């Protein structure tokens, strides 16, 4: 087949065939029929992603490469930040973001074991897990309903002389009160990590400027797992405007190396063999000098290739998510006597990840969810509900050590008991949204 072709000609033919294959076997989806299962999330893609994936595979560059560089550059440009590091998951991104704040390079602002980090228990566990894994103490504050984000009025009662940071997620795409939280962090000289994994594309107006979430704090994180706003299968990102934090993030991501050379590169600094570090002998190969205890958290170039194609489509994804959320909220008008419908935080433009619903008194969440599921609509809890109630906290609860609660978690407990959510992903049609709203209204009868 390729006997008379150059390598480039063969490659172009393979990619053209890949495009045809995708258009024939992947993109001929059956239209939604009433009664079909409606998932809360799904990947949305076309031939562009598959062509990029095959293009990368043909190079057989199995680690990070040209697509990784392209993605990091274009993603940083989209966000309006200077530095972006691609990683293998959103959970790794959160781990890396927090881990960066434990670096001795931060001097008196370094987070040490026993230092406190303010967060919430109503969310996903990997926002909190790095805090515990590094020996710091999460301090849990309650959230507000129907925004499902931290109540900033409770921050002052949570702070202590041990507090070093605030680490919060923008719940299902709804930005938390960034002005209040950022002012609080500035007032107390605290780090702010924005877990932006469920909120890519959301905006918040601060000091008269509309900015993307994840870029207002010191470090932001994203996830590219298939249900998220865009995907590369597995994958995540850490981003910042701070050059020192970027240097630390790259070190921790790449085994803890002091060297900035990418795999396969050598001696970019020109001083590979002529400097002395720690108590190593003069001239020890800088490629193998370690300034941190790090990991290998990089993604592959094949994942990045998919991400590059997704990123070009991303604005349309956000537009559709906003449409779907607004359509669903309009369709559920008249249910407010039984359900609390979600509301955007003030000064925000959410890129919604899901549609959160809290049952009012007299409506049993579990029974309602079961009826909705029986009608083919997939539902989800607000992740952990109240993380403190989970088995991973059993030992800490028993000893009363390892975490602290500031005030009550009344709304957090209510979310655990009464809240669920349904999807608004960009592949949903208006017919699917109508069916979801009908299923909920019928289940309430």
Language-model features, listed with the residues they occupy:
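N-terminal "arm"/small-domain region of PLP-dependent enzymes with the aminotransferase-like
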Residues: 1-62, 291
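Glycine-/small-residue-rich active-site loops that bind phosphorylated ligands and cofactors
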Residues: 45, 63, 123, 146-147, ...
């Amino acid at each position: 087949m390729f006997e008379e072709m150059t390598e480039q000609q063969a490659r172009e033919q393979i990619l053209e065939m890949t495009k045809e294959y995708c258009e024939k076997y992947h993109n001929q989806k059956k239209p939604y029929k009433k009664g079909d299962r409606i998932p809360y999330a799904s990947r949305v893609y076309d031939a562009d992603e598959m062509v990029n994936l095959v293009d990368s595979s043909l190079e057989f560059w199995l680690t990070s490469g040209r697509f990784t560089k392209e993605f990091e550059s274009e993603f940083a440009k989209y966000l309006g930040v200077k530095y972006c590091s691609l990683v293998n998951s959103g959970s790794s991104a959160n781990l890396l973001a927090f881990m960066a704040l434990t670096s001795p390079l931060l001097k008196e602002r370094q987070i040490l074991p026993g230092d406190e980090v303010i967060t919430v228990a109503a969310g996903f566990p990997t926002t909190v897990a790095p805090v515990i894994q590094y020996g710091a103490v999460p301090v849990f504050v309650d959230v507000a309903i129907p925004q499902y984000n931290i109540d900033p009025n409770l921050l002052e009662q949570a702070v202590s002389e041990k507090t070093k940071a605030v680490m919060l997620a923008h719940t299902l795409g709804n930005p938390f009160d960034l002005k209040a939280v950022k002012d609080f962090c500035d007032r107390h000289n605290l780090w702010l990590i924005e877990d932006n994994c469920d909120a890519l594309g959301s905006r918040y107006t601060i000091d008269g400027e509309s900015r993307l979430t994840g870029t207002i704090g010191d470090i932001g994180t994203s996830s590219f797992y298939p249900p998220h706003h865009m995907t590369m299968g597995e994958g995540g990102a850490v981003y910042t405007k701070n050059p020192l934090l970027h240097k630390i993030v790259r070190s921790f991501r790449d085994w803890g190396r002091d060297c900035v050379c990418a795999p396969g590169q050598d001696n970019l600094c020109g001083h590979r063999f002529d400097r002395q570090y720690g108590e190593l002998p003069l001239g020890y190969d800088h490629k193998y000098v370690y300034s941190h205890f790090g990991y290998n958290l990089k993604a592959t170039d094949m994942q990045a290739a998919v991400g590059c194609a997704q990123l070009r489509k991303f604005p349309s994804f956000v537009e559709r998510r906003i449409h779907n959320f607004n359509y669903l909220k309009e369709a559920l008008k008249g249910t407010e006597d039984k359900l609390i419908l979600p509301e955007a935080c003030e000064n925000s433009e959410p890129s919604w990840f899901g549609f959160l619903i809290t049952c009012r008194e007299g409506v049993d969440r579990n029974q309602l969810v079961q009826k909705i599921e029986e009608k083919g609509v997939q539902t989800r809890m607000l992740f952990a509900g109240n993380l403190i109630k989970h088995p991973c906290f059993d030992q800490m609860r028993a000893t009363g050590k390892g975490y602290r609660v500031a005030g009550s978690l009344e709304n957090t407990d209510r979310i655990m008991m009464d809240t669920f959510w349904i999807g608004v992903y960009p592949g949903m049609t208006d017919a699917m949204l109508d069916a979801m709203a009908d299923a909920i209204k019928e289940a309430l009868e």
